[in-house]
Design a protein with these regions (language model features):
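Short loop/turn and low-complexity linker motifs enriched in small/turn-promoting residues
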Residues: 1-193
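Short coil/loop residues immediately preceding or within conserved phosphate-binding loops
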Residues: 37, 107, 132, 141, ...
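A short glycine-rich, aromatic-capped structural motif
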Residues: 183-253, 266-281, 318, 385, ...
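Functional-site microenvironments in short loops/helix caps that host divalent-cation chemistry
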Residues: 205, 209-214, 259, 270-438, ...
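Short, well-ordered beta-strand elements within core beta-sheets of diverse protein domains
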Residues: 229-234, 265, 307, 368-372
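Surface-exposed aromatic
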Residues: 257-266
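Short, structured beta-strand segments at or near domain termini in extracellular proteins/domains
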Residues: 446-464
Length: 464
């Protein structure tokens, strides 16, 4: 077969492949030629604009488009940051038109206010000004970057709006500030505990003055400064959280169960609490804080960021409503406390305990569900009651001679007893319910539990 093509001025070519045997006659029906298209060559400055014809997408500039002849066609040209251009064309068959357009920028005003004021503003990689200047920019997306020596650069995609001045305010952060802005202020452990981030500033005083009512000899005044930010659980570890680690019974007191899922776990030793912390660390693939050997705690790695018990200094700082208060918020200048302000030895426990707070009723004769009472000003629950709490430190009495603050104290390196802090459902005396009260022990008690803590970063991490 051969391809046969018929052409005629002003009409589209007609082509068809024809096959015929020798000696045969092939009859072809009458051929009606179709008028040729009109042609439009489209270009824009800048190029890359979108073309629509009669609402239908026809590519981007530069482009050549073919249109039905002798018909009106509506051409629209779009490009981000430029005004839309619209044109109508009507061309005879076979006619060609060149349409070259210079697009008009659509401008929006942007005022960028930055602290510090000597910061420079870069748009799409080009330096355009300093803070406070009004930038006139095409109304399309731009990458804005703000730079200043000693600060982390700020990047943001902005889209100016025509006839509308935008005001953008930016506070640049130092590397240190940027780092801490990226650290979550609250985390949830795989054990179910919610922990809050704390970054204590300045120094505070542990202990109590000699004249304070209820003060004991081991509450020596000492200045302390905590420099390592840490996470601290908002609530005490519950029975059901501890059961994830191992089987355990918190038992009962006076015929009342201490073993409900949301009651704080009790009747565990300091070592059992530390082993739980290591289990939780391994569960989250964190370096354990406590050193173990044959299921015994033999030491600690103070550079580790795994879970641990709070240090006595951390506990004391977290429990205070201010830097110097030695009484809980519930008991400050108010003893006996108001009803249901915390879980202490109340009249509902009179059949269980020898001593209770007269005319005080918190509604719980033994341990309460954790978080049953209002938190302190730092958002922490039950620091002054419910159960007393194991802390990390060995017990000791340290005299702070002079005016120098101890930095991140962790207690003696060794000892026989561990420190217990906070009041409990068994405590009725104001001496035991003050925040400076220090108890000691090693063995399990039915009014002692714990809460978990962890450092944010290792001790040897270099400053940013």
């Amino acid at each position: 077969g051969e391809v046969v093509t018929i052409t005629y001025p002003g009409y589209k070519p007609w082509s068809k492949k024809l096959s015929i045997n020798a000696g045969d006659i092939l009859k072809i029906p009458e051929i009606e030629l179709v008028p040729a298209d009109s042609i439009v060559d489209l270009s824009t400055m800048p190029s890359g604009a979108t073309i629509t014809i009669n609402g239908e997408y026809r590519g981007n500039t530069p482009n050549t488009v073919y249109l039905d002849a002798d018909k009106k066609h509506n051409i629209s040209i779009f490009l981000n940051g430029y005004f839309t251009q619209k044109h109508s064309v009507l061309l005879a068959s076979g006619k060609r038109k060149n349409l070259s357009l210079e697009l008009i920028p659509s401008i929006g005003a942007v005022k960028v206010l930055v602290s510090p004021k000597d910061s420079t503003i870069w748009i799409d990689g080009k330096l355009l000004g300093i803070t406070g200047e009004i930038l006139q920019l095409p109304s399309r997306p731009h990458l804005m970057e703000i730079k200043n020596s000693g600060y982390v650069s700020y990047k943001k995609v902005i889209t100016p709006q025509p006839q509308l001045e935008q005001i953008i305010k930016v506070q640049l952060l130092t590397k240190e500030e940027h780092y801490w802005a990226s650290i979550p202020v609250e985390i949830t452990s795989l054990g179910g505990q919610i922990l809050k981030l704390f970054k204590p500033e300045g120094t505070f005083t542990m202990g109590a003055p000699r004249q304070e009512v209820g003060r004991r000899a081991n509450e020596v005044l000492r200045k302390v400064k905590i420099t390592r930010p840490f996470y601290l659980a908002t609530k005490e570890v519950t029975n059901d959280q501890y059961w994830q680690y191992k089987q355990h019974s918190s038992r009962h007191a006076g015929g009342k169960t201490l073993d409900r899922p949301k009651q704080p776990v009790v009747s565990i030793s300091w070592e059992q609490a530390a082993l739980y912390c290591n289990w939780l660390s391994r569960k989250e693939k964190l370096l354990p804080f406590y050193i173990e050997s044959a299921n015994k705690i033999t030491g600690s790695n103070i550079s580790a960021t795994g879970y641990r018990l709070p240090t006595e200094a951390e506990w004391a700082w977290a429990a205070r409503s201010s830097g110097s208060d030695n009484q809980s918020e519930n008991l400050h200048n108010n003893f006996p406390p108001k009803d249901k302000s915390g879980n202490f030895a109340d009249i509902s426990a009179a059949n269980i305990l020898e001593s209770v707070i007269p005319i005080y009723n918190d509604g719980h004769s033994t341990t309460a569900t954790v978080g049953s009472f209002n938190p302190n000003k730092k958002g922490l629950y039950d620091l002054d009651g419910n159960v007393a709490e194991w802390v990390n430190d060995y017990y000791g009495i340290r005299f702070n001679l002079g005016n120098t603050a101890e930095i991140d104290p962790m207690g003696p390196n060794e000892g026989e007893l561990k420190v217990i802090r906070g009041g409990s459902w068994r405590h009725s005396d104001i001496a035991q319910l003050r925040l400076s009260f220090r108890d000691t022990g090693n063995s399990a008690r039915d009014d002692v539990g714990f809460r978990v803590a962890r450092y944010v970063e290792s001790k040897d991490k270099k400053s940013r």
